[in-house]
C-alpha cells in the first residue's frame, strides 16, 4: 500500500497523552509495531499486509510523529512514549501484545517491557537504541542540528528535494536509492503540517538521553517474555554488539538472528525474511 492508502485506513483513539493514530489489519492475538524517530506506522506496512493472517497487527504513530495529535506541553520523551503505549492498549481494551520495535521505537519497547512486563506476550527487537547508546555517536550530528534550531529547514529541504533525504539517511538503508518519493512524503509531511508539529519533533529529539534506558536496566534484566533479537549487520548506528548486549540482558531471549549486510530499516527493505522470523517467533511463543 502507498502512503495515501495507509493514511486513508488510519484510525484514532483518545488517551491521556493525546489522540493516537494507528492502522490495523487482521484478527487474533495482537501484535503492536513501534517505529522510530522521524518515521511513523507506515514503516510497518509490509508487516501489516503479510502478517494479518497470523493475528491482529497494529502500527501506532508515536507521540510527536505521524498523525498522532498532542498538546504543546505533552511530554514526548521515550519514557512518556512507553507510558503512551500502555494507555493506548487500555483505550483499545487490549491486555497483552506481541511487541515489535525498531530504532528509537525499539528503545521505547525496552522501557515498556521493563515497566509493563505483564502486558507482553512476546518481544521482538530489531536494530535499536540500548543501554547507554542513545543517541548513537553517528546520530549525534543530527541531534546537534536539531538543538541548534535547524530541523524545520532540514525537513523542508528533504521534502523539496527527496535526494537530500536519501543522502542524509543513506546509512540507515541498505539501498537508499530505492526509497521512493511517496515513502519520504509519508514519513516527513506530517512533521511540517504546522509549526507546532515541527516543534513537537524537536522536543522528541532534544529529549534523547540514555538515562531513560539505563534507568530501567535492572527491570529489563527480569523480563521473561519470549524475545527475538533480529539485527542487521551493516549498521553504523547500532553495532552488532548491541544485539549481543540485549540478548544477554533479557533473560527471555530465545533467538538472536543476523541479517547480513542489512541496516536499521531492514523490516521495510527485507520484509519477507523478517516476517518469516516473526511468524516463527510468535508460533514458538504461543507454545511456550
Task: Kindly label every feature range from the protein language model.
Residues 29, 39, 46, 107, ...:
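Short alpha-helical
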Residues 262-271, 275:
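Catalytic histidine-centered segment of alpha/beta-hydrolase-like enzymes
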Residues 6-12, 20-23, 58, 65-100, ...:
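Flexible "cap/lid" subdomain of the alpha/beta-hydrolase fold that forms the substrate-access gate
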Residues 1-5, 287-288:
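Basic/polar N-terminal segments that are highly enriched at the extreme N-terminus
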Amino acid at each position: 500500500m502507498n502512503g495515501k492508502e495507509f493514511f486513508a485506513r488510519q484510525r484514532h483513539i483518545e488517551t491521556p497523552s493525546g489522540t493516537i493514530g494507528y492502522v490495523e489489519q487482521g484478527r487474533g492475538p495482537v501484535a503492536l509495531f513501534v517505529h522510530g524517530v522521524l518515521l511513523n506506522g507506515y514503516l510497518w506496512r509490509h508487516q501489516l499486509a503479510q502478517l494479518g493472517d497470523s493475528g491482529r497487527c497494529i502500527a501506532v504513530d508515536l507521540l510527536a510523529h505521524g498523525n498522532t495529535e498532542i498538546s504543546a506541553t505533552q511530554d514526548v520523551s521515550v519514557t512518556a512514549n512507553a507510558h503512551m503505549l500502555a494507555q493506548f492498549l487500555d483505550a483499545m481494551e487490549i491486555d497483552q501484545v506481541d511487541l515489535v520495535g525498531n530504532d528509537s521505537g525499539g528503545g521505547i519497547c525496552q522501557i515498556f517491557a521493563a515497566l509493563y512486563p505483564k502486558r507482553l506476550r512476546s518481544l521482538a527487537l530489531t536494530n535499536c537504541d540500548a543501554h547507554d547508546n542513545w543517541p548513537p555517536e553517528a546520530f549525534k550530528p543530527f541531534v546537534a542540528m536539531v538543538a541548534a534550531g535547524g530541523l524545520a529547514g532540514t525537513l523542508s529541504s528533504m521534502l523539496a528535494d527527496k535526494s537530500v533525504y536519501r543522502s542524509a539517511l543513506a546509512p540507515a538503508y541498505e539501498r537508499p536509492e530505492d526509497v521512493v518519493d511517496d515513502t519520504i512524503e509519508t514519513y516527513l509531511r506530517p512533521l511540517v503540517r504546522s509549526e507546532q508539529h515541527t516543534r513537537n519533533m524537536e522536543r522528541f529529539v532534544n529529549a534523547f538521553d540514555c538515562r531513560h534506558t539505563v534507568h530501567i536496566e535492572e527491570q529489563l534484566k527480569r523480563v521473561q517474555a519470549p524475545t527475538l533479537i533480529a539485527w542487521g549487520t551493516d549498521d553504523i548506528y547500532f553495532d552488532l554488539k548491541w544485539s549481543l548486549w540485549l540478548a544477554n540482558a533479557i533473560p527471555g531471549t530465545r533467538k538472536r538472528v543476523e541479517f547480513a549486510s542489512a541496516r536499521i530499516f531492514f523490516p521495510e527493505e527485507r520484509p519477507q525474511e523478517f516476517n518469516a522470523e516473526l511468524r516463527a517467533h510468535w508460533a514458538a511463543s504461543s507454545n511456550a
